[in-house]
């Protein structure tokens, strides 16, 4: 939990070096049960619209790629000429390069490329999820062929076309017209650019003038291997009083500026929809463009009350009363307004599902605790291991409350071999749409449970296992600053983002009101270790115990320290911890049991 301050003292006058001998940690390993994994049983009757990413390989020189809509089925008709439905899922034209095109659609799409078309500055775009083009050796003179694709029973619908451009240039997206005869709800698509930090976007807002129950469709993403499926669920949501509510938004953390694509529910009514030809000038790589349909009947979102898509917001400035409904797989829940917290900037809270005696919390208690974390203004909950059905219970609560999870593989005194069971449990659980980060080890090097090179190898092994089960997010470990400074050369290549536990209390020259500036200085020092972004995975201040020089524990002191931490580094920090851990040993300065701080957030 605590980090030695071995870098040059910055931002805190008179800061002394922390005593590395005072690094005996919180004793997370003193109670870790490994319970049998219990898979979730999906609820019957869930409505869903599956919009599956299809991968189509094209061979040809750099050119403009027209994407045509397939011929309609009897329930709809198209006024534009469309290619015949072939019998294979890839369209191949032999040429001098191979590029992969990802296209998200509700119908089979045939992609035709004309060799020799000159497009100034244009490169072949990839549709759907951003992908990396693959190079190949020259294949000789181009010769067109049209492989067959299995016929599909789905009718083309005017869902927005999502295209990701991996290179700069000028691109043309051809016009398409579709006539729809039947009303249906589908997965639309929207893009937004997120700067570095934690953001909330998507979902559906509803404004009610009195207590009421809202039933509406919400869209979500469920990854499985290399396929990402957008699904629509019907949600029943209880608005307890008049106000503005957000139903099923998405909250995520991005280390750098990123363009994200997320699904939105859209009701397609009978009518003619036109997607005009679009010329797109791409000035940056990994650029994503959504080409919408327009027409006599525009797709609309959310059917009950006054609803609309939710714009992107950051946790620094929440402007609406936000509440999240559970999917139709669970009973409807009663929502409460989400307060702004200390200053509305705190990212995450650690949570361990243990009782004061060291037993496992009941499912009802876990659901209640996680709901309170959301109400206090947090966007993430950090879980250390798979103990006490933590993934299942906390995962269910996180989904109901619109929280994201930072999950962990805990390495104890049994070493790396003893942690493998948790890796297996996580890959079976595989609720990856909830997860933004996996932390392999919590101060495992600091505690002497492994060495840096062995940990780096285990991180890489875990990452491969997680990716094979559908995870595409970041993986890291977390250690105090002194370990990173000593072992960064071995660890940096294995992690996607540098994770650190930064506790100002363990520096004897830091007062509570200096906690934020002290940790900010440590983060700046850590950024130079791997030249990667840094996330503070544990930080806080004890509410009881004995003083460590100027670092004095106490309720008032904890409040001052938490306020300083939120103001300085809250958007990139996980606060330790939800409640006091009375099952632990007293530890140095008699503070190890008294880090619970959820009550400091209003």
Swiss-Prot record:
Location of the protein in the cell: Secreted, Cell wall
Name listed for the protein in its UniProt record: Probable beta-glucosidase btgE
UniProt-listed Gene3D superfamilies: Glycosidases (3.20.20.80)
Record's keyword annotation contains Secreted: yes
Name of the encoding gene: btgE
Active site positions, chain numbering: 443 (proton donor), 538 (nucleophile)
Entry similarity comment: Belongs to the glycosyl hydrolase 17 family.
Pathway named in the protein's UniProt entry: Glycan metabolism; cellulose degradation
Top-rank taxon: Eukaryota
GO MF annotation terms: glucan endo-1,3-beta-D-glucosidase activity
Compositional bias of kind Polar residues: 152-166
Biological-process GO terms, alphabetical: cell wall organization; cellulose catabolic process
């Amino acid at each position: 939990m605590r980090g030695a301050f071995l870098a040059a003292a910055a931002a805190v006058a008179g800061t002394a070096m922390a005593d590395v001998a005072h690094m005996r940690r919180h004793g997370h390993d003193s109670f870790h049960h490994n319970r049998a994994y219990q898979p979730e049983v999906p609820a019957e009757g869930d409505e869903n619209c599956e919009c599956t990413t299809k991968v189509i390989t094209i061979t040809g020189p750099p050119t403009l790629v027209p994407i045509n809509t397939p011929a309609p089925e009897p329930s709809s008709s198209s006024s534009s000429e469309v290619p015949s439905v072939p019998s294979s899922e890839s369209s191949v034209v032999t040429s001098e390069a191979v590029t992969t095109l990802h296209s998200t659609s509700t119908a089979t799409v045939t992609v035709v490329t004309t060799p020799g078309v000159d497009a100034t500055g244009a490169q072949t775009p990839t549709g759907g999820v951003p992908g990396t083009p693959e190079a190949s050796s020259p294949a000789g003179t181009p010769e067109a062929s049209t492989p067959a694709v299995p016929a599909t029973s789905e009718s083309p619908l005017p869902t927005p076309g999502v295209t990701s451009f991996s290179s700069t240039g000028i691109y043309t997206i051809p016009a398409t017209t579709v006539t729809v005869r039947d009303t249906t709800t589908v997965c639309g698509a929207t893009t937004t650019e997120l700067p570095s930090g934690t953001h909330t976007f998507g979902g559906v807002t509803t404004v009610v003038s009195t207590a009421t129950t809202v039933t509406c469709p919400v869209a979500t993403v469920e990854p499985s291997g290399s396929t990402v499926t957008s699904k629509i669920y019907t949600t029943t949501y209880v608005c307890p009083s008049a106000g503005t509510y957000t139903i099923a938004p998405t909250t995520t953390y991005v280390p750098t500026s990123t363009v994200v694509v997320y699904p939105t529910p859209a009701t397609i009514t009978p009518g003619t929809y036109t997607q005009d030809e679009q010329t797109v000038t791409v000035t940056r790589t990994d650029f994503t463009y959504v080409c919408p349909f327009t027409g006599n009947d525009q797709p609309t979102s959310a059917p009950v009350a006054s609803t609309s898509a939710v714009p992107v917001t950051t946790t620094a400035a929440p402007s609406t009363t936000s509440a999240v409904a559970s999917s139709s797989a669970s009973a409807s829940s009663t929502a409460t307004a989400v307060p702004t917290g200390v200053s509305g900037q705190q990212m995450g809270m650690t949570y361990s599902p243990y009782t004061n005696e060291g037993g496992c919390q009941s499912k009802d208690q876990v659901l209640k605790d996680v709901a309170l974390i959301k109400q206090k203004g947090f966007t993430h909950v950090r879980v250390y291991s798979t103990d006490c059905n933590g993934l299942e219970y906390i995962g269910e609560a996180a989904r109901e409350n619109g929280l994201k999870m930072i999950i962990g593989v805990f390495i104890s005194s049994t070493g790396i071999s003893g942690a493998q069971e948790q890796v297996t449990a996580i890959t079976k659980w595989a609720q990856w749409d909830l997860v933004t980060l996996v932390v392999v080890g919590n101060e495992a090097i600091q505690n002497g449970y492994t060495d840096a090179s062995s940990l780096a190898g285990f991180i890489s092994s875990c990452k491969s296992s997680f990716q094979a089960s559908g995870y595409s997010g970041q993986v890291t470990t977390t250690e105090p600053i002194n370990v990173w400074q000593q072992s960064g050369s071995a660890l940096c290549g294995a992690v996607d983002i540098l994770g650190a536990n930064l506790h100002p209390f363990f520096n004897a020259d830091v007062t509570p009101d200096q906690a934020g500036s002290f940790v900010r200085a440590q983060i700046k020092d850590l950024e130079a270790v791997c030249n990667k972004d840094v996330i503070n995975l544990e930080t806080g201040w004890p509410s009881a115990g004995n003083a460590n020089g100027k670092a004095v524990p106490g309720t008032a002191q904890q409040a001052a320290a938490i306020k300083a931490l939120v103001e300085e580094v809250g958007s990139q920090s996980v606060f330790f911890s939800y409640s006091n851990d009375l099952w632990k040993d007293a530890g140095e300065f008699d503070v190890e049991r008294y880090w619970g701080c959820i009550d400091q957030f209003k």
